[in-house]
């Protein structure tokens, strides 16, 4: 096969296939719904790896599974096989990334059903906003208690279950990052009720899209524009009212 072009490599990267270093083979990233794979799905992933990859599978830090060693020409068949088994490749690009959640659903320390909330966010924003471009990747994490095993404070948007006055409330972190540039997420000034989480998340992403520069992470936008500006925007529904206008606009370029 002729040497792959950058256009070909980038075209499949957007579908969840990352080139393996020094080869023309790819790792396909399979994203779970609500962080959970069924036994049947895992059997299918193993079969997919044997048919199209090198027989190996690796868990990612965002609770997805990567299947390495897939030849470029086999990617369409791998996608078709995956979809026939209720599996979906993805998890790349400047948009909402795969949602992560701790085992709060079953953990003795979990204060609420973390996987149910992760599934709701997955369906509403990972899937529902799959065509929405953001200034940079946007990582969301759902934690069941202050032990923070899933590290919500180092995600762009993190949820942490807390207990106050005999009921569960939610601490929200914004702007966290990890890696080359580390920034602890900034906690919102008040804890929120469960029904407030998704509207606040959507406002955060709309604010980020309107204020962020291309290739700028949410935390850097917060530092540049001001946390007080973000909190003021979250206190009203103006961003939701202007949602279509914000999503239709071009991403800002850094001056």
What is each PLM-predicted segment?
Residues 1-25:
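Intrinsically disordered, low-complexity polar/charged tails and linkers
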């Amino acid at each position: 096969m002729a040497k792959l072009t950058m256009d070909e490599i980038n075209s499949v990267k957007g579908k969840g296939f990352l080139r393996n270093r020094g080869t023309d083979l790819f790792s396909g990233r399979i994203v779970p719904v609500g962080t959970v794979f069924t036994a049947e799905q895992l059997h299918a992933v193993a079969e997919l790896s044997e048919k199209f990859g090198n027989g190996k599978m690796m868990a990612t830090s965002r609770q997805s599974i990567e299947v390495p060693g897939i030849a470029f020409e086999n990617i369409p068949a791998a996608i078709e096989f995956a979809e026939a088994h209720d599996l979906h490749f993805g998890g790349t690009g400047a948009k909402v990334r795969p949602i992560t959640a701790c085992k709060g659903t079953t953990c003795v320390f979990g204060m609420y059903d973390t996987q149910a909330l992760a599934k709701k966010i997955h369906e509403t924003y990972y899937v529902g906003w799959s065509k929405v471009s953001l200034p940079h990747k946007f990582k969301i994490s759902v934690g069941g208690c202050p032990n923070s095993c899933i590290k919500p404070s180092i995600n762009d948007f993190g949820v942490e279950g807390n207990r106050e006055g005999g009921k569960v409330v939610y601490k929200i972190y914004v702007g966290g990052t990890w890696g080359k540039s580390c920034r602890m997420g900034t906690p919102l000034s008040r804890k929120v009720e469960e029904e407030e989480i998704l509207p606040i998340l959507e406002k955060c992403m709309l604010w980020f899209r309107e204020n962020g520069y291309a290739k700028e992470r949410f935390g850097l936008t917060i530092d540049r524009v001001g946390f007080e500006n973000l909190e003021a925007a979250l206190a009203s529904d103006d961003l939701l009212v202007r949602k279509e206008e914000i999503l239709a606009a071009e991403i800002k370029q850094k001056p």
